[in-house]
Amino acid sequence: MKNLTILGSTGSIGVSTLDVVKAYPDMFRVVALTAGNNLELLKTQIETFSPDLVSVLTAEKAQALSRSLTGKKPEIMHGVEGMIAAATASETTMVVAAIVGAAGLVPTTAAIMAGKDVALANKETLVTAGHLVMQMVREKKVNLYPVDSEHCAVFQSMAGHRSQDIARVILTASGGPFLNWGREKLQAATVADALNHPNWSMGRKITVDSATMMNKGLEVIEARWLFDIPVQRIGVNIHPQSIIHSMVEYVDGSVMAQLGTPDMKGPIAYALTYPGRVPSGVKALDLTALSGLTFFKPDTDRFPALQLAYRAADAGESMPAVMNAANEIAVEAFLGGRIGFMAIAEAIEKVMDLHEPHALASIEEVLEADRWGRRTAKEVLGVGC
């Protein structure tokens, strides 16, 4: 039996993870859960899975949660201290890192340093601190399993092959809700428009990232660290049907791909049960029902965020952390109705132009670069979000 901590249990990935866990009570036990603001859902999860420990955002929310629970209560903590306690709980053997954004970095690295295997859905951990995180993974001899559908697809497509045999990795992207929108129409895109993803059901932040194509840019950087492949050998193809989740091209010209119905329970179940497989609840793929599979190159004129991510990856050092921080602030401002859709990438570029990349030797230095990026993005945008 695997004992699990789920960081971000009330988010999209966390909820899907618990769906998988619930289907296999003889395989998994939930030791700890962490959540941000959704106390009602967390309360339901506590009643269903009986964790030993839960952590929420603030002391006030911890008190409110405690008052709402009846019967036997788990230990309730809050803040970063609570997240770290959940990530490093002695009985936990695997941590599902599903917190959105750079906030997931500290608890995820704490889990690694505590010797826990990690199912990684928080791509920002590798975007901001990839070199440090992979060094920790090697030193602690833990397993890092990708939960992003694209990286899970690459992981499966690389199985049994040597890294020197790989010519390139090709990540697929749906193109998001604005695939066929022109620049003029994009200028007037609303929050509701951006959140209307055609294929995937995800959280608000990642759905906006998909609309700008920053999500794919973050995934390029994540793949660079996960698979130790130069970013110049990681490409992106637009694939509107979201059936092929990514591909690996080998030096002999062969291409291996992983296909499946778009549903995050698939990669989650694979990460939780690797090297085995279990029925995940994902609808079986019927290729005969598809009218076709199409692919084309991304339009970086309409979606400049992807090119900004490649630029950050090429610059390296502190630039990816700063870019990610600027993106989080800009997306938050867009979701709050304070800036337009196209202003997201414009703000990120301005912040990157102001930044001089420098080496990052510790997680604290990564966090400082993150703080600089956030402060500068707020100044550039003129917002106080």
UniProtKB/Swiss-Prot annotation:
Catalytic activity entry: 2-C-methyl-D-erythritol 4-phosphate + NADP(+) = 1-deoxy-D-xylulose 5-phosphate + NADPH + H(+)
Cofactors demanded by this protein: Mg(2+); Mn(2+)
Recorded superkingdom: Bacteria
GO molecular function term, any single one: 1-deoxy-D-xylulose-5-phosphate reductoisomerase activity
Entry keyword Protein biosynthesis: no
This protein's pathway: Isoprenoid biosynthesis; isopentenyl diphosphate biosynthesis via DXP pathway; isopentenyl diphosphate from 1-deoxy-D-xylulose 5-phosphate: step 1/6
Binding site residues for Mn(2+): D148, E150, E219
EC numbers for this chain: 1.1.1.267
Gene Ontology BP term (one): isopentenyl diphosphate biosynthetic process, methylerythritol 4-phosphate pathway involved in terpenoid biosynthetic process
The entry's keywords: Isoprene biosynthesis, Manganese, Metal-binding, NADP, Oxidoreductase
Binding site for 1-deoxy-D-xylulose 5-phosphate: K123, S149, E150, S174, H197, S210, N215, K216, E219
Family in the record: Belongs to the DXR family.
PANTHER family for this protein: 1-DEOXY-D-XYLULOSE 5-PHOSPHATE REDUCTOISOMERASE, 1-DEOXY-D-XYLULOSE 5-PHOSPHATE REDUCTOISOMERASE, CHLOROPLASTIC
Summary of the function given for this chain in its UniProt record: Catalyzes the NADPH-dependent rearrangement and reduction of 1-deoxy-D-xylulose-5-phosphate (DXP) to 2-C-methyl-D-erythritol 4-phosphate (MEP).
NCBIfam families: Dxr (TIGR00243), PRK12464.1 (NF009114)
Name recorded for this polypeptide: 1-deoxy-D-xylulose 5-phosphate reductoisomerase
Source organism of this protein record: Citrifermentans bemidjiense (strain ATCC BAA-1014 / DSM 16622 / JCM 12645 / Bem)
Lineage: Bacteria, Pseudomonadati, Thermodesulfobacteriota, Desulfuromonadia, Geobacterales
